[in-house]
From Swiss-Prot:
<dbReference type="InterPro" id="IPR036069">
    <property type="entry name" value="DUF34/NIF3_sf"/>
</dbReference>
<feature type="binding site">
    <location>
        <position position="103"/>
    </location>
    <ligand>
        <name>a divalent metal cation 1</name>
    </ligand>
</feature>
<dbReference type="Pfam" id="PF01784">
    <property type="entry name" value="DUF34_NIF3"/>
</dbReference>
<dbReference type="InterPro" id="IPR002678">
    <property type="entry name" value="DUF34/NIF3"/>
</dbReference>
<feature type="binding site">
    <location>
        <position position="225"/>
    </location>
    <ligand>
        <name>a divalent metal cation 2</name>
    </ligand>
</feature>
<protein>
    <recommendedName>
        <fullName>GTP cyclohydrolase 1 type 2 homolog</fullName>
    </recommendedName>
</protein>
<comment type="similarity">
    <text>Belongs to the GTP cyclohydrolase I type 2/NIF3 family.</text>
</comment>
<comment type="subunit">
    <text>Homohexamer.</text>
</comment>
<dbReference type="GO" id="GO:0005737">
    <property type="term" value="C:cytoplasm"/>
</dbReference>
<feature type="binding site">
    <location>
        <position position="228"/>
    </location>
    <ligand>
        <name>a divalent metal cation 1</name>
    </ligand>
</feature>
<feature type="binding site">
    <location>
        <position position="228"/>
    </location>
    <ligand>
        <name>a divalent metal cation 2</name>
    </ligand>
</feature>
<feature type="binding site">
    <location>
        <position position="65"/>
    </location>
    <ligand>
        <name>a divalent metal cation 2</name>
    </ligand>
</feature>
<keyword id="KW-0479">Metal-binding</keyword>
<dbReference type="GO" id="GO:0046872">
    <property type="term" value="F:metal ion binding"/>
</dbReference>
Length: 265
C-alpha cells in the first residue's frame, strides 16, 4: 500500500488545518507516493530514532515534533543535525509531522492527559478555530495541591516534578478545577486563570513566568515536555485499529528509543 493511504486515514482523524498558525506540520521529508511495509510512530526524530528506523526497515515515521524547525543553511555531513536528515533521505524514510493539530483535535493528546488524570467536563483553554482550541480545563475529584502533584508524578512515571508555589501552606490548598496543556504551554496560563483553574499543568515553565503565575493567584505543576511521549503508544494503537478495520498489510511499530534529554539526581 502507499504511504498516502495511511496519512489520508490519519488526517481524517487529525486534520492538518487544525494546526496553529505557523506550525511545522505534514510531510517534511520524502514522499507519500511510495509503497510501504513498516510505519513507526515517534515523539522526536533524533539520532537514536533514525538508527532504530534504519535497523527495523521502516518506510514512514509519524512524529509529533518536527525534525526541521529552524532554517537549514546547508546539508554538510559534518553537522550532527544534518546527518539525521542525510540518513533519512539515504534510506528513503519519509517523515510526517503531527504537532499542534494532535494537541487541538478532539480525543487527541490533551484529552488523553485529562482521561489519565480524571479531569472531566472539559473545554479548551484558548480557541483556535470553530469549536476547537488548545489546552483543556475541567473538574477533578476534590483534593489538595500536594495530592494532585503526587498523582501527576505517578501517572506520568516521573522521577521528579516541579511545583510552582511559595508557601508550604499551598500544599494543602483544595483543588477541584485543573487546566492542562502538553508541551510548552506557559503562554496560555492567563486563559487557565480566566477559566477558573486552581492549578495549571504544563511543561517548560520559565522562572519569571512562574513568579507571574503566583502573583496572579495560580498554582502550577511542570511535569516537563516528555509526558507527550504517550503520543507514541496512542497513535500506534490507532494505526493498528485502522489496519485491522481497513485490512492494511503493514507493520505498525511504536518507537522504543528514548529521546528525553533530561534526567534528575
Amino acid at each position: 500500500m502507499l504511504a498516502s493511504e495511511v496519512i489520508q486515514a490519519y488526517e481524517a482523524f487529525c486534520p492538518q488545518e487544525f494546526s496553529m498558525e505557523g506550525d511545522s506540520r505534514g510531510l517534511q521529508i520524502g514522499t507519500l507516493d511510495k509503497g510501504i511495509q513498516r510505519v513507526m510512530v515517534a515523539l522526536d526524530i533524533r539520532e537514536e530514532t533514525v538508527a532504530e528506523a534504519i535497523e527495523k526497515g521502516v518506510d514512514l515515521i509519524i512524529v509529533k515534533h518536527a525534525p526541521i524547525f529552524r532554517p537549514i543553511k546547508d546539508l554538510l555531513a559534518s553537522r550532527p543535525q544534518n546527518q539525521i536528515y542525510i540518513d533519512l533521505i539515504k534510506h528513503d524514510i519519509a517523515v510526517y509531522v503531527s504537532h499542534t493539530n494532535i494537541d487541538i483535535v478532539e480525543n487527541g493528546l490533551n484529552d488523553w492527559f485529562c482521561q489519565m488524570l480524571g479531569i472531566e467536563e472539559t473545554t479548551y483553554l484558548q480557541e483556535t478555530g470553530p469549536e476547537r482550541g488548545i489546552g483543556r480545563i475541567g473538574n477533578i475529584q476534590p483534593q489538595t495541591f500536594w495530592e494532585l502533584a503526587q498523582q501527576v508524578k505517578q501517572v506520568f512515571d516521573l522521577d521528579s516534578l516541579r511545583m510552582v508555589h511559595y508557601q508550604e501552606d499551598d500544599l494543602q490548598k483544595p483543588i477541584s478545577r485543573v487546566a492542562i496543556c502538553g508541551g510548552s504551554g506557559q503562554s496560555f496560563y492567563k486563559d487557565a486563570l480566566a477559566k477558573g483553574a486552581d492549578v495549571y499543568i504544563t511543561g517548560d515553565i520559565y522562572y519569571h513566568t512562574a513568579q507571574d503565575m503566583l502573583s496572579d493567584g495560580l498554582l502550577a505543576l511542570d511535569p516537563g515536555h516528555y509526558i507527550e511521549v504517550i503520543f507514541v503508544e496512542k497513535i500506534a494503537a490507532l494505526l493498528s485499529q485502522w489496519k485491522e478495520d481497513k485490512g492494511w498489510s503493514i507493520d505498525i511499530l511504536p518507537s522504543q528509543a528514548s529521546t528525553n534529554p533530561f534526567h534528575h539526581i
